[in-house]
């Protein structure tokens, strides 16, 4: 009985071992299959020689495209001309009216002040008045008149040059010179300086440090007409004909020069103490130049104006500095205290 049981147990153990061997054999087959699949997958993912060549070609092409092109770009032009910034838009030159209006507008923004309209009714030298000293005074023969002056000591700059700038529908001219186009770069630069209240380089070379009086006339509704040559009558010092004893006479070239004369007889001047020169721009556009002592007061300047021009005796007017534009309200101040030595002051009617 014991032997039979042992044999049965042996049979059972052998069966279990066989089953285990079969199971392990099955597991080993599955692992082997998986490994074969992985090997096949790696082989499929491994690039071929052709794939490597194509990838290398793409890499070279990308690097070439990333490099900046050294070929010139045609049709691209960068211009930085001052006249193009100021007078052109979209490649077009603005109308003459716009150019002229901008000139007056910007000149006013740079310190120009309107002159009293009474200058129109006075009839004395009514024309385009403008720019004196180291700045300008802008004017117009019809509606617009502006004045702009800056800088000190305008009397020690040497000669004085009077220039008339006429603005036409088809260009501008200086004095009786030739027509100059608005679209020309040099001419546009000239006008740009005027707009800024600066002396154009062209005029600086002309006066060599002298004083510039630049008049502006608005003729934008007219085309330029070349002026006829004018005969200038003799003016200055000469001899009177028909006199037994030749008499030396002096004829001023214009009424304006009469007002430029020093009227020292109107002022009690002490030559033994320091003096200064004051230029007075009157409301009618004319001017007076007078020497004063530093101790003279603003009220003395007012009295001088009334004595020199009696038509202002019944007028109420104010005196102002030019740059900045400040009314001289305290007339008991001396010229030195008011800080107006060797300067230009304005008369404005109230």
Curated annotation (Swiss-Prot):
Ranges where the record places region Disordered:
1-46
Signal peptide, first to last residue: none
Q: Which SMART domains match?
A: SEP, UBX
Biological processes, Gene Ontology terms: autophagosome assembly; Golgi organization; membrane fusion; nuclear membrane reassembly; proteasome-mediated ubiquitin-dependent protein catabolic process
Acidic residues: compositionally biased ranges: 1-29
Q: Which family does it belong to?
A: Belongs to the NSFL1C family.
Q: GO CC annotations?
A: centrosome; cytosol; endoplasmic reticulum; Golgi apparatus; nucleus
- Protein source organism: Xenopus laevis
Q: What is this protein called?
A: UBX domain-containing protein 2B
One GO molecular-function entry: ubiquitin binding
Q: What is its main location?
A: nucleus
The organism sits in which domain of life?
A: Eukaryota
Cite the entry's keywords alphabetically.
Answer: Cytoplasm, Cytoskeleton, Endoplasmic reticulum, Golgi apparatus, Nucleus
Q: Which residues form the SEP domain?
A: 160-225
Residue ranges with Basic and acidic residues bias: 32-45
Location in the cell reads:
Nucleus; Cytoplasm, Cytosol; Endoplasmic reticulum; Golgi apparatus
């Amino acid at each position: 009985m014991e032997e039979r049981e042992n044999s049965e147990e042996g049979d059972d153990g052998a069966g279990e071992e066989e089953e285990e061997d079969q199971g392990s054999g099955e597991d080993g087959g599955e692992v082997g299959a998986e490994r074969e699949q992985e090997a096949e997958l790696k082989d499929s993912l491994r690039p071929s020689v052709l794939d490597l060549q194509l990838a290398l070609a793409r890499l070279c092409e990308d690097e070439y495209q990333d490099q900046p092109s050294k070929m010139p770009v045609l049709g691209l032009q960068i211009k930085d001309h001052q006249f193009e910034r100021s007078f052109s838009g979209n490649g077009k030159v603005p109308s003459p009216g716009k150019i002229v209006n901008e000139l007056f507008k910007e000149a006013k923004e740079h310190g120009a002040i309107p002159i009293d309209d009474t200058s129109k009714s006075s009839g004395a030298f009514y024309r385009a008045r403008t720019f004196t000293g180291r700045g300008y005074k802008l004017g117009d023969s019809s509606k617009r008149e502006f004045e702009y002056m800056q800088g000190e000591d305008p009397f020690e700059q040497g000669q004085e040059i009077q220039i008339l700038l006429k603005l036409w529908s088809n260009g501008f001219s200086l004095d009786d010179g030739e027509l100059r186009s608005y679209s020309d770069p040099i001419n546009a630069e000239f006008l740009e300086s005027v707009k800024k209240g600066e002396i154009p380089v062209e005029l600086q070379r002309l006066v060599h440090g002298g004083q510039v009086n630049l008049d502006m006339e608005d003729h934008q509704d007219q085309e330029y007409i070349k002026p006829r040559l004018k005969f200038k009558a003799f003016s200055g010092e000469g001899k009177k004909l028909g006199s037994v004893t030749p008499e030396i006479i002096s004829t001023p070239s214009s009424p304006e020069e009469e007002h430029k004369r020093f009227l020292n007889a109107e002022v009690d001047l002490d030559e033994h103490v320091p003096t200064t020169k004051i230029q007075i721009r009157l409301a009618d556009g004319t001017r007076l130049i007078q020497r004063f002592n530093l101790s003279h007061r603003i009220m003395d300047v007012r009295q001088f104006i009334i004595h020199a021009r009696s038509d202002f005796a019944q007028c109420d007017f104010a005196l102002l500095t030019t740059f900045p534009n400040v009314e001289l309200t305290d007339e008991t101040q001396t010229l030195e205290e008011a800080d107006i030595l060797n300067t230009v002051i304005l008369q404005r009617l109230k």
